[in-house]
Amino acid sequence: MSFVTVRHFTEDDVPTRIALLRESRFQANLTDFAVVSSDDDLTAGQFRTIAEEHDTKRILTLCAPGGETVGFAWITSIDWRAQTCELSFGVLPRYRGAFGAKAVIAAHTHIRRELNMRVVINQVLEHNTMLVSAGDLTDRRRVRCAYDSYTVGEWRTACYWTETQEEAQRTLDALDERRREIAERIRATSAKASAS
């Protein structure tokens, strides 16, 4: 059973997503267009995405095991023929530590398995190290675009890279191996402490 599940974004999700769009860290790390948009304009935009724009972009709701909303993922720049898209996500502040990484994995898994996307375009603003360390960001990026985004009064540099299905699986396998190594070290340390 998956730790985070993905479901379709609905009208009931709009107020929660608008609150996320207005959150300060979200604005600094992704986009701050919500600062200059009214609630009515933001609501209309979300409803338009739900009703009319599924061929070019989609919003997904990320849920904890009990069904509560922990965040959202959205895909843009969809090319159905080439099976590519850009994936973005935002986790609600109170769930970032507990669900952040699992939410990202769930979103990637969903768009690959359910929407048949083979290549995902990733964009992360260079200062945003909430999920990817600065070193990993430098290693992954293929394009570095200075002055890419203007958020909360500053020009931001963006890093872009693509990730195929095979590359994503290798990353997941490496994470699983690291978790196993850590668990084994903890077990070994606990066994030594118990024997003493």
Residue ranges: model-predicted function:
Residues A28, F33, A51-E52, R94-Y95, ...:
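Short, contiguous strand/loop micro-motifs
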Residues R48-T61:
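A short helix-loop-beta-strand connector motif used in the catalytic cores of GNAT acetyltransferases and
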Residues F26-F47:
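Conserved GNAT-fold acetyl-CoA-binding loop/helix
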Residues M1-E23, C63-S196:
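Acyl-donor (CoA/ACP) binding surface of acyl/acetyltransferases
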Residues D32, V36, R58-E68:
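An N-terminal domain-start capping segment
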Residues H8-F9, G45, T49:
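Hydrophobic, helix-prone linear segments
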Residues D39-L42, I50-E53, R94-Y95, E154-T157:
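Short, intrinsically disordered/low-complexity patches at protein termini
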